[in-house]
Amino acid sequence: MSVNIDSRVVTSGSDDHVDEAWQLKEAINRQEGVLKQRYDFFTSAYRRSTVYCYLQEDELVGFAAVRRDGYILFLAVSPDCRGQGLGKRLVARVADEHDTITCHARTSNENALQFYEHLGFEIKRRIDNYYEDGGDAYYLKLGSDAGLADRISELVRR
């Protein structure tokens, strides 16, 4: 059975899908103990970002909130939709617009680290006490070469 996934782009300054994104983030937080941002921080950062969204039957199932410089503030895919390539497609969408993509991931978030490393991100440095709760982070980077979009597109096709 084929499932249709619609994509949308929320431009900076918009509230479109912010509540659904918050609810998805919170569901992941409850289940996995990651994505621990406070509501005010999350919504403010969301509104200042370009947000790439995937919806299934009008329900938000994945999103990436990205700054103008290609820094991914938030990347989340519903646990029910993982393994379908949505995360890769979100990163590929970011790669279409940016030569370099960067992000932070908790040192304890093995799922995220495996995902990013599979896509070719490199850990550039560790930052102790990066998060508000004292959690440590890795700063990750992908790209800065002309073939970034092609490499990501190839991964998505796999």
Please report, for each region that a protein language model flagged, where it lies by residue.
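Conserved N-terminal entry element of GNAT/NAT acetyltransferase domains
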Residues: M1-D16, L142, A146-R158
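Accessory recognition modules or surfaces
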Residues: Q84, K88, G135-D145
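Acetyl-CoA-dependent GNAT
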Residues: S12-D80, K88-R93, V156-R158
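Conserved catalytic-core motifs of GNAT/GCN5-like acyltransferases
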Residues: H104-R106, E122-Y139, R151-I152
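Conserved beta-strand segments that form the floor/walls of ligand-binding pockets within enzyme
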Residues: Y71, A76, T102-H104, Y139
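Conserved glycine-rich acetyl-CoA-binding loop
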Residues: F74, S78-V91, R106-Q114, H118-L119
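Short secondary-structure capping/turn micro-motifs that flank functional sites
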Residues: F41-F42, N109-N111, E132-D133
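Conserved GNAT acetyl-CoA-binding A-motif
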Residues: D96-N109
